[in-house]
Amino acid sequence: MNGNYRHQVIKRLQAGLPRGAPFDLATLSQFGVSPQLAAHYADGGWLVRLAHGVYAFPNDEFGVYGALKFLQQRVPGLHVGGKSALALQGVRHNLGSREALVLWGDGRFALPAWFTSRFPARYVHARLFDWPDTALASKTLTTPPGLPEDLRVAAPERAVLELLYEAGVKQSLEEARNLFDGLRSPRKDLLGQLLSCCASVKAVRLFLTWARETSLVDVDALLEQYPVRTGSNTRWMSRLDDGTLLSLKPHG
């Protein structure tokens, strides 16, 4: 393969691939770039090798959203969740600029070093919902206004249950309550559906308790209309990682 051909290919890459995100060997192959040629380009400084099979253009300071969309193609169910999802939709409490981004996904996954070195983040994998079908799972992921197309973010109704699942563990109970207090006009039908398939008794009961205290929704009407998973008829009690003894009644 002569140098002129390699130069032509890299020119096509530079013209055809948008800046702002990494790319992989599958994408490079669409431009006629083999793994060997990609390695050659990396050795020559035309590409930067981020990890095995993952590249970017040199001096391309790609942003978190481009990187997330790249990971979304590889990690089932990956989305911005919990506190981070609420913040992107206007519900925030003293959010620091370097605060770790909360990401959720459907399976075990370790965020790659090239991502976490640029964007402080943590990944949560938990079976929080027993989805009755894929439609509800998809319907509760959205792209808030102003964000790149197809970037997946948990809708507020889903994000708050992700937040409450982590309350007292990775998320302080006090901040969780402050964020909960910032919720406005949740969609009651969507909430009812989510509470009916939420597998965390703690998250469900904490939601019902705080919803009663804040009058966020009519809890009794919600319980009457939907088969909300509240667990047994006894109190749910647990000492959280932060030392708090949490005691929750079945219906809030």
Predicted regions and their residues:
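Short beta-edge/loop segments at beta->alpha junctions of small alpha/beta modules
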Residues: M1-S84, R184-A203, H251
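Hydrophobic alpha-helical interaction segments
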Residues: F31, A137-G252
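Long, compositionally biased
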Residues: L68-Q72, T116-P120, S196-A199, W210-T214
